[in-house]
């Protein structure tokens, strides 16, 4: 990734995080924009979102993001329009790394416990 795309991705990550903090309904799952990947032509930004909540909440959150993509892009354009000629199209993807890390920690704890019982 070039320095330009890295800077754009970083700015989009910050701004999308702030937008989601204000726009996403309270009382739902915790949404965090963990990464943004931008194409070389800056025409498309893929935002990876970590969602902490139940399976139903995660599904609802992804539906919300996909349904509101156009509105989120519009809000984004009002916030950063002086820095870009064209605002990239947005795509949202769920990042389950946090969930996978918790599962690995649980497995490691159970292995340590089993080793302690067998000693």
Curated annotation (Swiss-Prot):
One matching Pfam family: RBFA
Location in the cell: Cytoplasm
One GO molecular-function entry: ribosomal small subunit binding
Recorded coiled-coil stretches: none
Keywords linked to the UniProt accession: Cytoplasm, Ribosome biogenesis
GO cellular component: cytosol
BP-aspect Gene Ontology terms: maturation of SSU-rRNA
Annotated InterPro entries: KH_dom-like_a/b, RbfA, RbfA_dom_sf
Subunit annotation: Monomer. Binds 30S ribosomal subunits, but not 50S ribosomal subunits or 70S ribosomes.
Role according to the record: One of several proteins that assist in the late maturation steps of the functional core of the 30S ribosomal subunit. Associates with free 30S ribosomal subunits (but not with 30S subunits that are part of 70S ribosomes or polysomes). Required for efficient processing of 16S rRNA. May interact with the 5'-terminal helix region of 16S rRNA.
Record-stated family: Belongs to the RbfA family.
Protein name: Ribosome-binding factor A
């Amino acid at each position: 990734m070039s320095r330009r795309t890295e800077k754009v991705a970083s700015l989009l990550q910050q701004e999308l995080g702030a937008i989601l903090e204000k726009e996403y309904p309270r009382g739902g799952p915790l949404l965090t924009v963990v990464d943004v990947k931008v194409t070389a032509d800056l025409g498309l930004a893929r935002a990876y979102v970590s969602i902490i909540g139940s399976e139903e909440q995660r599904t609802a959150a992804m539906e919300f993001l996909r349904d509101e993509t156009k509105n989120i892009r519009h809000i984004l354009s009002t916030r950063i329009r002086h820095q870009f000629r064209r605002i990239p199209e947005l795509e949202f993807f769920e990042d389950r790394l946090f969930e996978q890390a918790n599962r690995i920690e649980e497995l490691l704890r159970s292995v340590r416990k089993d080793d302690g019982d067998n000693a």
